[in-house]
């Protein structure tokens, strides 16, 4: 009798584990919302920081005694190129 009781007690975790696996199989779309939220916030902070660094590196050269930019800098050259391309008449293709 004792051996039957020992065998049944050894089989109980197996039966419970298989029941837990069946329960997990019923819900295939389980999301860990806490991890998803933290990952999204970390991703947003990284993108925000990269954006701020790009803006500051483009505009500020970290020097207070720096001369103002000359009118012939690269941004002005790009604007002039755009306006000259827009002013040229487009040729009709026949």
From Swiss-Prot:
Segments crossing the lipid bilayer: 35-57
Keywords: Cell membrane, Ion transport, Membrane, Potassium, Potassium transport, Signal, Sodium, Sodium transport, Sodium/potassium transport, Transmembrane, Transmembrane helix, Transport
Gene Ontology biological process: potassium ion transport; regulation of monoatomic ion transport; sodium ion transport
Pfam families assigned: ATP1G1_PLM_MAT8
Cytoplasmic topological domain: 58-94
UniProt KW Transmembrane helix keyword: yes
Keyword Membrane: yes
Entry's localization field: Cell membrane
Gene Ontology cellular component annotations, sorted alphabetically: glutamatergic synapse; postsynaptic membrane; presynaptic membrane
Top-level taxon in the UniProt lineage: Eukaryota
Example GO molecular function: ion channel regulator activity
InterPro entries (UniProt xref): FXYD_motif (IPR047297), Ion-transport_regulator_FXYD (IPR000272)
Membrane topology field: Single-pass type I membrane protein
Signal sequence, renumbered to the chain: 1-17
Extracellular compartment segments: 18-34
Role of this protein: Associates with and regulates the activity of the sodium/potassium-transporting ATPase (NKA) which catalyzes the hydrolysis of ATP coupled with the exchange of Na(+) and K(+) ions across the plasma membrane. Reduces the apparent affinity for intracellular Na(+) with no change in the apparent affinity for extracellular K(+). In addition to modulating NKA kinetics, may also function as a regulator of NKA localization to the plasma membrane.
Subunit text: Regulatory subunit of the sodium/potassium-transporting ATPase which is composed of a catalytic alpha subunit, a non-catalytic beta subunit and an additional regulatory subunit. The regulatory subunit, a member of the FXYD protein family, modulates the enzymatic activity in a tissue- and isoform-specific way by changing affinities of the Na+/K+-ATPase toward Na(+), K(+) or ATP.
Similarity comment text for this entry: Belongs to the FXYD family.
This protein's name: FXYD domain-containing ion transport regulator 6
Native source organism of the sequence: Mus musculus
Record lineage: Eukaryota, Metazoa, Chordata, Craniata, Vertebrata
Gene: Fxyd6
């Amino acid at each position: 009798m004792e051996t039957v009781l020992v065998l049944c007690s050894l089989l109980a975790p197996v039966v419970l584990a298989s029941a837990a696996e069946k329960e997990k199989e019923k819900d295939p779309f389980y999301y860990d919302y806490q991890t998803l939220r933290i990952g999204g916030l970390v991703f947003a902070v990284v993108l925000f920081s990269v954006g701020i660094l790009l803006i500051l590196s483009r505009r500020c050269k970290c020097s207070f005694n720096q001369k103002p930019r000359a009118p012939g800098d690269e941004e002005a050259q790009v604007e002039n190129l755009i306006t000259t391309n827009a002013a040229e008449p487009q040729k009709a293709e026949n």
